[in-house]
From Swiss-Prot:
Belongs to the universal ribosomal protein uS15 family. Keywords: Chloroplast, Plastid, Ribonucleoprotein, Ribosomal protein. SUPFAM superfamilies: S15/NS1 RNA-binding domain (SSF47060). Part of the 30S ribosomal subunit. PANTHER family: RIBOSOMAL PROTEIN S15, BACTERIAL AND ORGANELLAR, SMALL RIBOSOMAL SUBUNIT PROTEIN US15M. GO terms for cellular component: chloroplast; ribonucleoprotein complex; ribosome. Pfam families: Ribosomal_S15. The keyword Cell membrane does not apply. This is Small ribosomal subunit protein uS15c. The keyword Chloroplast applies. Gene3D superfamilies: S15/NS1, RNA-binding.
Length: 87
């Protein structure tokens, strides 16, 4: 499973406060909530939580893209997420 290999790599390389680790945790939460919401479509509290986590992850990714573009590209490729839209 891809998730387990990413966990071992990130947890060994990074500290828990790093941007990469935080984005990784948010991505796991997003995937869990998405699968939960597929079963429970009217769980509006979980929908709100998902939107909040998506916003936090988006802000962290924008920060990382601004500070270090190479680390940003590696992270989005490793986590298999789309690149954020730039204005």
């Amino acid at each position: 499973m891809v998730k387990n290999s990413v966990i071992s790599v990130i947890s060994q390389e990074e500290k828990k406060g790093s941007v990469e680790f935080q984005v990784f945790n948010f991505t796991n939460k997003i995937r869990r909530l998405t699968s939960h919401l597929e079963l429970h479509k009217k769980d509006y509290l979980s929908q709100r939580g998902l939107k909040k986590i998506l916003g936090k992850r988006q802000r962290l990714l924008a920060y990382l893209a601004k500070k270090n573009r190479v680390r940003y590209k590696e992270l989005i490729n490793r986590l298999d997420i789309r690149e954020t839209k730039t204005r």
